[in-house]
Amino acid sequence: MKLIRVTLFLCALAILLLVTPTSSLQLKHPYSSPSQGLSKKIVTKMATRKLMIISSEYVMTSTSHEGSSEQLRVTSSGKSKDEEKKLSEEEEEKKALAKYLSMDYRTFRRRRPVHNKALPLDP
């Protein structure tokens, strides 16, 4: 009976020790107030070659400007400046993330394989 209690205690202790280190890997969604204009966007992507995890990034949102009654400035392309600004921010984010998420290898010059090359004769 005492042996069963000891084995159950050791099993529970082993499970507790295994669960505790992995609980820190779970992502928790923090709450942010809309008055700050910041929202935390959780991105969970892993590039296996570089072994990097991008856990989170801050993204500015213009929720306070969307409800205003001001007229939007329109450029010659027909898009408002706010839309163009959002598009340019998205492009910058993609460029910044490309170095972590890309699977591109450095370019290198390939040599022709050496087949049937005559071996130098030793004297």
UniProtKB/Swiss-Prot annotation:
It comes from Arabidopsis thaliana (Mouse-ear cress). Residues 79-92 have a biased composition (Basic and acidic residues). The modification Sulfotyrosine is found at Y105. GO terms for cellular component: extracellular region. Residues 30-103, 117-123 form a propeptide. Keywords: Differentiation, Growth factor, Hydroxylation, Secreted, Signal, Sulfation. One of its GO terms (molecular function) is growth factor activity. Transmembrane segments: none annotated. Expressed in roots, shoots, flowers and stamens. 'Golven' means irregular waves in Dutch. This is Protein GOLVEN 6. Residues 61-92 are annotated as: Disordered. Residues 1-29 form the signal peptide. The modification Hydroxyproline is found at P113. Belongs to the RGF family. GO terms for biological process: cell differentiation; regulation of asymmetric cell division; regulation of lateral root development; regulation of root meristem growth; regulation of root morphogenesis. Residues 61-78 have a biased composition (Polar residues). The gene is GLV6. Disruption phenotype: Altered PIN2 traffic.
